[in-house]
């Protein structure tokens, strides 16, 4: 008799049950691992799968997490370069791709990452045909469109992390300005996750008090308090972090876990995430941009119709045209 047999006697033969909330992270770079640890620390999955082409790095990262299993609620952490390890995932977070270099725009990255997606997406679909795809790789809006096209999934199951982080950066900066917690500062960044994002100044409020009623010039050129600078800091935020530490990771990882939580817990929370916006706010082309969306167990269930000022709508359309200009050149 083995030690195990001496110690444990089975009452019944356990039937293998599938995981209810299996989360897969594709890509174990800085963003992938920050997303993985954020998901684990928030107890959002009963199994975590990691996938990457770099086998040693993948094995090392998985072992490192497994060694901490005692401190986590999730003890099943698996990793392989073979996508069969991802089978039956509820949410698949795609962070893989070429990393943005210092000074490189997110749009520059695009064709490099499209080619990577041509391998990744069909493999995800093969093993988790009912999953929700959460795309994080940059340029996220274009790559969410690419993932949607390559997967054949309905649009509600392909979501881009979009401006969820930009809006968090914006609310953090508002909080600093007013010495308040970011959760008490309300403001939305929509459009492209990147250089042409749009700050919805008309919706910025604290405790329901619209700041534009207190400062009608807020966000405009004639604003003595120069609030426009706050939005510029949001746009420059990632570039600044990349310049200082070489990459961004923690905030985007926490942002990803925030989105995963709304999905797996069916919270019906509203997030600014990237979705198909064709036919909304004057956008004519088949592009993905961030607007406020409701996330739950089925994925992206609803879209909130924002009241945008003509200037804000114009910026959104311009953002869409910029993305479409790049998209139509892509070879899928």
UniProtKB/Swiss-Prot annotation:
GO terms for cellular component: cytoplasm. Pfam families: Ldh_1_C, Ldh_1_N. Its EC number is 1.1.1.27. Transmembrane segments: none annotated. It catalyses: (S)-lactate + NAD(+) = pyruvate + NADH + H(+). The active site is at 193 (proton acceptor). Homotetramer. NCBIfam families: L-LDH-NAD, PRK00066.1. This is L-lactate dehydrogenase A chain. It comes from Fundulus heteroclitus (Killifish).
